[in-house]
Swiss-Prot record:
Any one GO molecular-function label of the UniProt entry: hydroxymethylglutaryl-CoA reductase (NADPH) activity
Phylogenetic classification of the source organism: Eukaryota, Viridiplantae, Streptophyta, Embryophyta, Tracheophyta
Protein's recorded name: 3-hydroxy-3-methylglutaryl coenzyme A reductase 2-B
Species annotation: Panax ginseng
Glycan attachment residues as annotated in the record: N256, N332
Described function: Catalyzes the synthesis of mevalonate, the specific precursor of all isoprenoid compounds present in plants. Component of the triterpene saponins (e.g. ginsenosides or panaxosides) and phytosterols biosynthetic pathways. Promotes triterpenes accumulation in roots.
UniProt catalytic activity: (R)-mevalonate + 2 NADP(+) + CoA = (3S)-3-hydroxy-3-methylglutaryl-CoA + 2 NADPH + 2 H(+)
């Protein structure tokens, strides 16, 4: 295994002239010419720079206030300017030259590198890039072999082989040391990426340590073939591998006169096939149409006052149209795309819940709206100093949980999608009839859901399609809860011959930038739908189109499942496509 190496000295035999060269080169330093120790000299010039800068800015402000010409300079100001220039020259000379030299390096002869121990140590101690291959055939210090001219390759081969064998033993030993440290608890597992500088190596070491601690094998969990650098600090902490979920394609879905191939990541048999059948029925009937009703993400902080009267005063202030422009100005400065749309308040005793709604461009927008809300809370603190902010989220938002406020007011994208399915398509493709579908929809999705006390669940299986598309497209799977709020309506039209079907989904929460959308697999699925990344024309159309595609896919899934139920095909199809025959055979044996 490849690990981050310490400066390798064991690969060089003792007594070689490299050591003497290293000692000679390090005997004299530029800092030896300074009258004070290096840290004191640096501290002195830093203090001088900031002190003189503060003095000059203070004098400049006084001159502007007193209408004194800026070119009139006193003796103290002249001395301050001289000290400022001197400190700038020193700091640039001390820090700037070294930085420039690190960017523009000469190309030394390859044989000079072989005779320079410092060059070998510098290359060997350099951190390998994140997600580099975990099995490395050559250690970093052997990369210099590539720079050796062809005529010297034979003379260099023996040195390469000797160093390779020595380094391999060191790598294994260091890997074992790190694993033992993680198992013993002396090295925190979460710090491996920062300590090693190699995300793939960190995942491999963490994985091995976990297996030793638990005594359980992770052989079936893949490790290689994933870009762990892409999730660092963004998608997942302390990774030990990745889970594989198959992706199927349903479609083409003909929506708003455009065809889409819908990626669905699922482990449920029949789901993709059923949705695909619904897409076929919609396509054969002329396609579906969707309309975006609302587009606004919400966040609702909770604050507390000493009395209900004070809480009501803030409520009236926030809901007063005269104050909206000021609040929007404060809110909008947190982002180029976040624009405040409205504030709705609710009181519970002396506690006030403020539900902010804002547009978020092509992002799902939770972080964006949270930053804007924080700006408004800081602003309100000036006029309401007795306001005690209890939490940036008070569950009046409401995120990742079923809530009537989302069902009624909406959250994210509110979409309605409809289609008229022709009578012959219902019979030939869906294997049922219009009257049976309409009656079953009333009994199951409307009356049955009401009997169950459903909240936003007036549908057959909207969450099945939403979850599958969300996983494939890099959305937050937990937001499937409110995103699956859906009411499915069916009605006989054209003298009872054709079927009008619609789905109304008030809180589809999607984005095409940020989060899991930047991962390679999920990005490819978004690209398939034509909604990858942010729109170049204006903020928002990609995420709104993705929400419409989700609603159209749900429409297809609802149509197919309800037809299977009406025709009595559900059990038969699941026994054929959704059984684990391998597990059954094992149990029978």
């Amino acid at each position: 295994m490849d690990v981050r190496r310490r400066p390798v000295t064991k690969t060089l035999t003792a007594g070689e002239p490299l050591k003497s060269q290293n000692q000679h080169s390090s005997s004299l330093k530029a800092s030896d010419a300074l009258p004070l120790p290096l840290y004191l000299t640096n501290g002195l010039f830093f203090t001088m720079f900031f002190s003189v800068m503060y003095f000059l800015l203070h004098r400049w402000r006084e001159k502007i206030r007193n209408s004194v010409p800026l070119h009139v300079v006193t003796l103290s100001e002249l001395a301050a300017l001289v000290l400022l220039v001197a400190s700038v020259i020193y700091l640039l000379g001390f820090f700037g030259i070294g930085f420039v030299q690190s960017l523009i390096r000469p190309s030394p002869d390859s044989w000079d590198i072989l005779e320079d121990d410092n060059a070998i140590l510098e290359e060997d101690s350099r951190c390998e890039p994140c997600a580099a291959a975990i099995d490395c055939s050559l250690p970093p210090n052997l990369k210099i072999a590539r720079m050796v001219p062809q005529k010297h390759k034979s003379a260099f081969a023996d040195v390469v082989e000797e160093q390779k064998q020595s380094a391999s033993a060191t790598i294994i030993d260091e890997d074992e040391e790190i694993i033992n440290a993680v198992v013993a608890g002396t090295t925190p597992s979460y710090s491996l990426e920062s300590k090693l500088g190699d995300c793939l190596k960190a995942a491999a070491i963490r994985r091995e340590a976990l297996q030793r601690i638990t005594g359980k094998s992770l052989d079936g969990l893949p490790l290689d073939g994933f870009d762990y650098e892409s999730i660092l600090g963004q998608c997942c902490e302390m990774p030990v591998g990745y889970v594989q979920v198959p992706v199927g394609i349903a479609g083409p879905l003909l929506l708003n006169e455009t065809e889409y191939s819908v990626p669905m990541a699922t482990t449920e048999g029949c789901l993709v096939a059923s949705t695909n059948r619904g897409c076929k029925a919609i396509y054969a009937s002329g396609g579906a149409t969707s309309v975006l009703l609302k587009d606004g993400m919400t966040r609702a902080p909770v604050v507390r006052f000493g009395s209900a009267k004070r809480a009501a005063e803030l409520k009236f202030f926030l809901e007063d149209p005269m104050n909206f422009e000021t609040l929007a100005l404060v809110f909008n400065k947190s982002s180029r795309f976040g624009r405040l749309q409205g504030i709705k308040c609710a009181i519970a005793g002396k506690n006030l819940y403020m539900r902010f709604t804002c547009s978020t461009g092509d992002a799902m927008g939770m972080n964006m709206v949270s930053k804007g809300v924080q700006n408004v809370l800081d602003f309100l603190q000036n006029d309401f100093p007795d306001m005690d902010v209890m939490g940036i989220s008070g569950n009046y938002c409401s995120d990742k949980k079923p809530a009537a406020v989302n069902w009624i007011e909406g959250r994210g994208k509110s979409v309605v999608c409809e289609a008229i399915i022709k009578e012959e398509v219902v019979k030939k493709v869906l294997k049922t009839n219009v009257a049976a579908l309409v009656e079953l929809n009333m009994l199951k999705n409307l009356a049955g859901s009401a009997v169950a006390g459903a909240l936003g669940g007036f549908n057959a299986h909207a969450s099945n399609i939403v979850s599958a598309v969300y996983v494939a497209a890099g959305q937050d799977p937990a937001q499937n809860i409110e995103s699956s709020h859906c009411i499915t309506m069916m009605e006989a039209v054209n003298d009872g011959k054709d079927l009008h079907i619609s789905v109304t989904m008030p809180s589809i929460e999607v984005g095409t930038v940020g989060g899991g959308t930047q991962l390679a697999s999920q990005s490819a699925c978004l690209n398939l739908l034509g909604v990858k990344g942010a729109s170049k024309e204006s903020p928002g159309p990609n995420s709104r189109l993705l929400a419409s595609i989700v609603a159209g896919s749900v429409l297809a899934g609802e149509l197919s499942l309800m037809s299977a139920l009406a025709a009595g095909q559900l059990v038969k199809s699941h026994m054929k496509f959704n059984r684990s025959s391998k597990d059954v055979s094992k149990l029978s044996s």
